[in-house]
Every structure is written in C-alpha cells, then in structure tokens.
C-alpha cells in the first residue's frame, strides 16, 4: 500500500521591507533650528516730552552720520546749536509714500542713526494716506477717519503705520539706530486695584478700547522709550522749576517709559553724549 505524502506548511512571508513598493509622499518632518544671538544690530529708541524740552537737540547728538527726517521743520530753528554735528537732512518728504520710498532707497551705508522727527507728524501722513487709498467698504465718501464706521478707521491707520515700523526694522538689522521723536499727551491710566491716575505718554493714536493703538504698539516695538521732562517741585498747589531736565528710562507714576539696558534717570545736559555712551558704549561716535 503506497505511503501517504505529508504536506509541508508554506514558509512564512518574508519580513524584509519591500523597497520596490510605493514611497510615501509625506514631507520630511521639520526640525527646530538654533542660531547665534545676533550682535551689531541697532537700537530702536522713542523719545517724547513737552515742547522745547530738547527732544530734537538730543536726537541730533546721536552717533553720526545722522539721517534726519525733519517732518516738524525743527532743524532750521536750532541754527548754530547744530554746528559740528554730522546731520544729513532727508529732503523731499511730503507724504507717507515719500517717507517709505526714502527708507527703501539706496545710499544708507554710511548712516549710523535715522531720526524721524516727529512720529506724531508721521502718523498724520499715515492718516492722509489712509483716507486717499483705503476705500469705504460700501463705497461711501471718506473725508475723516470716523467716516469708515465705528473703530474701522483706526484699524486702517494702525495697519498702515505698521509698515513704517517694518521698514525701520530693516535698518535696525543692518546695524543702524532708529530714533522716533514724539510729542506728548496726558492720558488716564486705569488702575484695577485702586484709583486711576494720569501720566505723560507719547502722542500717538490710542483709542479708548485699546485696540489698534499705535501708542502701545510703538512701546512694544521700542528697545528704549524715554520721557524727557523738566524738573519741577510742587508746594501748596504751586509749581516751580529750576530749568534742569531729566531723561526717564523707566516707568513711573507720571510717565510711560521703558529701557532694556538703562536703570537710572539721567540729567539732560546741552549736547551731552552721556545717553548714547550708556546705550551704545563709550566709542559710540
């Protein structure tokens, strides 16, 4: 009788990866990148204070050559106070487009500091540009910021002004210092833990809602927000001063301020380079 043949089990499927199969189209997973801390970039500085305190004169003594956007027509009044300073007046600035075009033009290689005097006036140019170029969503005629509707005009101006800060950031990354000179205003400070109070702040757009506040955005943008004020004393409701002036680099009840490097107030003296030496080093010139 014939012997039955035993069937053998089939060999297990190979566990070797088949490289001939379809490949995944998924992009490679991104990895975090690390770099060195950038040295040699410029400082973003904002100064503000009452009229005549010396904002323009101080800016003119910054490390030169100083390129000056004299939107307030201040330099011609200062006259011989500017003797010996390396100031290069940027001309032909009559509109917001002129201001931005100049910042994007070639020829900045030798400049160490850019001054816009004032950012308050630059904001006026931004408003005029907004009214001219941003239409009403329903096609209505626009003559004032309020004509856009509740709060919308402030949003438009805010977005326009941000383009200037971006332009200036390019110069900061190239190693140039930027100084925005602002006029001042008195603003109410809400205090959740007690009574509100008033203080000096830069005169820039800042709606009560806090939204679209150019003032608060500029404070965030700046490395140094410096208040320049006269030294006064008040007794029995009467104020008196001695003519001395102080640069405040830190927030106090009477002024908005900040600095990434300065800790103490400085006396503001005529054509003194002390501020720039403390900010940029003794060889800042």
Would you name each region that the model predicts?
Residues 30, 52, 99, 161-164, ...:
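Amphipathic coiled-coil/heptad-repeat helices and related helical stalk/stem segments
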Residues 57-59, 170, 217-218:
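Hydrophobic/aromatic ligand-binding patch that stacks against planar heteroaromatic rings
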Residues 29, 35-128:
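Conserved P-loop
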Residues 187-285:
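Conserved GTP-binding G-domain of TRAFAC-class P-loop NTPases and closely related GTPase folds
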Residues 66-67, 178, 225-227:
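Short, well-ordered beta-strand core segments
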Residues 119-214:
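P-loop NTPase motor core
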Residues 109, 174, 220:
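Structured loop/turn residues at beta-strand edges in well-structured enzyme cores
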Residues 3-36:
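N-terminal pre-Walker A segment at the start of P-loop NTPase domains
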């Amino acid at each position: 009788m014939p012997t039955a043949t035993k069937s053998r089990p089939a060999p297990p499927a190979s566990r070797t990866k088949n490289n001939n199969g379809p490949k995944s189209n998924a992009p490679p997973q991104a990895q975090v990148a690390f770099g060195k801390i950038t040295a040699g970039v410029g400082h973003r500085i904002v100064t503000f204070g009452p009229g005549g305190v010396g904002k323009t004169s101080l800016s003119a003594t910054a490390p030169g050559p100083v390129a000056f956007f004299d939107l307030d027509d201040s330099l011609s009044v200062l006259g011989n106070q500017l003797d010996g300073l390396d100031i290069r007046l940027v001309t032909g600035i009559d509109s917001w487009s002129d201001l931005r075009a100049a910042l994007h033009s070639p020829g900045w290689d030798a400049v160490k500091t850019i001054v816009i005097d004032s950012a308050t006036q630059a904001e006026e140019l931004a408003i005029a540009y907004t009214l001219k170029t941003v239409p009403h969503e329903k096609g209505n005629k626009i003559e004032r910021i309020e004509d856009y509707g509740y709060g919308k005009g402030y949003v438009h101006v805010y977005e326009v002004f941000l383009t200037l800060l971006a332009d200036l950031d390019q110069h900061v990354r190239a190693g140039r210092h930027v100084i925005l000179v602002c006029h001042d205003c008195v603003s109410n400070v809400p205090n959740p833990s007690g009574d509100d109070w008033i203080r000096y702040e830069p005169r820039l757009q800042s709606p009560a809602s806090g939204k679209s506040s150019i003032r608060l955005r500029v404070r965030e943008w700046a490395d140094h927000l410096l208040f320049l004020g006269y030294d006064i004393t008040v007794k029995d409701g009467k104020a008196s001063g001695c003519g001395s002036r102080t640069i405040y680099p830190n927030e106090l009840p009477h002024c908005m301020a900040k600095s990434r490097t300065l800790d103490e107030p400085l006396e503001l003296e005529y054509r003194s380079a002390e501020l720039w030496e403390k900010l940029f080093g003794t060889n800042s010139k």
